[in-house]
Amino acid sequence: MSSDSRPPQPDTSTQSNSESESPAISSPTPQDHAPMTNRDWWPNQIDVSMLHPHPSQASPLGADFDYPKEFAKLDVDALKADVMSVMTTSQDWWPADYGHYGGLFIRMSWHAAGTYRIQDGRGGGGQGMQRFAPLNSWPDNVSLDKARRLLWPVKQKYGSKISWADLIIFAGNCALDSMGFKTFGFGFGREDVWQPEEVMWGEEDVWLGTDKRYSGKRDLAQPYGATTMGLIYVNPEGPEGKPDPVAAAHDIRETFARMAMNDEETAALIVGGHSFGKTHGAGDADLVGPEPEAAPIEQQGFGWKSSFGSGKGKDAITSGLEVVWTPTPTQWGNGFLELLYGYEWELTKSPAGAWQFTAKDGAGAGTIPDPFGGPGRAPTMLVTDISMREDPIYRRITQRWLEHPEELTEAFAKAWYKLLHRDMGPVSRYLGPWVAEPQLWQDPVPDVDHELVDAKDVAALKSKVLASGLTVAQLVKTAWSAASSFRRTDKRGGANGGRLRLEPQKSWESNEPADLDQVLSVLEGIQQDFNSSAAGGKKISLADLIVLAGSAAVEKAAKDGGHEVSVPFAPGRTDASQENTDVESFAVLEPRADGFRNYVRVGEKAPLEHLLIERAYRLGVTAPEMTVLVGGLRALGANHGGSKHGVFTDNPGVLSNDFFVNLLDMGTEWKASEAAENVYEGCDRSSGQLKWTATANDLVFGSNSVLRALAEVYAQSDAKQKFAEDFAAAWAKVMNNDRFDLE
């Protein structure tokens, strides 16, 4: 949806089920595997490697590199000045439209941040993934390799004090500032990774394909955030290249909502973003060469080399569309809406053959400046721009802004800030002097405004919790319910904020609302007693007490098993209010399944073992940590609803390695249950007597060769103390996942 939001398309009558005649940049040709990989031989095998996405060995900076510490040495004003200078210094190897790279940098930042999707928190600009495949070679990212190369001298100058992830996003913010727009703020703090991460962007095997992500009338499958393989949001020519602005509005609304944007934010981003720069479709896209990942080695990562004319400047081909939205493409103003409503529009084609709109009957001819000093042009718009006028909801919004441009300015500033920062988590993670005040979408939590509990208080509170009548299983499940809502992808959820007691989390089926209410009532009583009697203004938040209670239960269960462990506890969590909790936004954190609790939502069709791996990935735990957590939680009796599946012990509530010992016992033979779906029965191999029941969440630790190797370690006779210690460490990690203040 930004200034070059879709590359030229193939003959989509065969490749995308479209009748579009738009030109195409050829799709990569899949190469035969030699040799075949394990995933080729066994495509349904779970991918345990996804739990180790960014090993420290991959970083040239070393495991001890501290980005916030390095960033603190950065002169951000000097950095901004240098980025501004790059923006207005045109390079012969890729000349700047209108002498200004602002539009290109906005598109680069937008397309980095805009991959974010709310359903699973993946995507976004937080790790600099645009540098790597597939994003660096997506059809929607044509020519963004040039934008990053323009910034290389700046990155080279400031070195590790500024990450690529931050610089890519910051450049777009600087572009707006340089063209007269007052931005809402900016937060640094995105740390680079050093290799691509496998993300399911879609099942289609051709660029610009759509056939495997839709069902029904036009129901976009979860968790996808884009309508089309290789695009950030939607096809700017309309659905499947059919130039229908009303149908395009449906796609726009759906895809932007999946990035957590409402109608006003969506319209603000489109109108605001398209107030700058232009798109590029000067000629035949068949003359454009391969993307960076397929380009010849001598091009050094430069892709899409074009033989149309000079291949750059006035001859540039990026999207195949040739649109300049306003008479002032390097200056903020209300020109986009003034033109959108100031003319009637007729459907035309770009020089590259892509559908777009031009002012009707030659109106406005010559009023739009040429980027390189040529004759003036006629006003033009994308199909998706006309959607802002033809869709009744977008029309009401944009007509109001036409009359009140100051409202557009404010809406765009806030929506742009949200776009750039949506995947960064709480504002406590932001660095730099330009961070705006906390916003509702950042899931704000209050600052600590009281003295924290000390070691003596912690010991006393643990004793009260354990004497409260609540069971080990209840305390463990409650703490797990709070902390396991965290997801590493966009740093949302977790125990901090105490939102387990608020809507929507307190009503989630996975959290067993009736039992949860009972536990919280007891813990709130303990909290109130302590806070009303503690000396020196000490208090404990319910968020802290929930975690402390779970940790006390783990320590007790370990002691009951003959093992002394200490679960680290750091107070400092606070309790958020319902008013500062966006119920609709939090709803996407509700688990479809949680294999750690042996929970699955009714009707879920995906294999449980795959959902377990996905859950572990979002929690940021390694394969060994996932293994020890599942085994320990089963021993503690922490299953959803008190289910006995996977509770391979005669002493539930005691922290032991019984899960692994009994899972790997060859005296047990497993078979699928005839009485219950997704349940397996473990019977004595000799007598046939039923011993245990399990789900795939349990049996995967015996069937998958990698996980079995880990399970064997914890089933060894010398592993009992190690198991208890490893469980305590993994438990503490999950409890502290959202404690960015401890990093």
Curated annotation (Swiss-Prot):
Positions that bind heme b: H274
Crosslinked positions (Tryptophyl-tyrosyl-methioninium (Trp-Tyr) (with M-259)): W110-Y233
Required cofactor(s): heme b
GO cellular component: cytosol
Biased composition (Low complexity): 16-28
Primary enzyme class: oxidoreductase
Keywords: Heme, Hydrogen peroxide, Iron, Metal-binding, Oxidoreductase, Peroxidase
UniProt cross-references to CDD domains, sorted A to Z: catalase_peroxidase_2 (cd08200)
Biased composition (Polar residues): 1-15
Record GO biological process: cellular response to hydrogen peroxide; hydrogen peroxide catabolic process
Post-translational note: Formation of the three residue Trp-Tyr-Met cross-link is important for the catalase, but not the peroxidase activity of the enzyme.
Annotated stretches, region: Disordered: 1-40, 490-511
Cross-link (Tryptophyl-tyrosyl-methioninium (Tyr-Met) (with W-110)), chain numbering: Y233-M259
EC number of the protein: 1.11.1.21
Reaction equation(s) it catalyzes: H2O2 + AH2 = A + 2 H2O; 2 H2O2 = O2 + 2 H2O
Molecular function in Gene Ontology: catalase activity; heme binding; metal ion binding
Cofactor note (record): Binds 1 heme b (iron(II)-protoporphyrin IX) group per dimer.
Residues annotated as catalytic: H111
Protein family per UniProt: Belongs to the peroxidase family. Peroxidase/catalase subfamily.
Function as written in the Swiss-Prot or TrEMBL entry: Bifunctional enzyme with both catalase and broad-spectrum peroxidase activity.
NCBIfam families per record: cat_per_HPI, PRK15061.1
The name this protein goes by in its record: Catalase-peroxidase
Source organism of this protein record: Mycobacterium marinum (strain ATCC BAA-535 / M)
Lineage: Bacteria, Bacillati, Actinomycetota, Actinomycetes, Mycobacteriales
Gene designation: katG
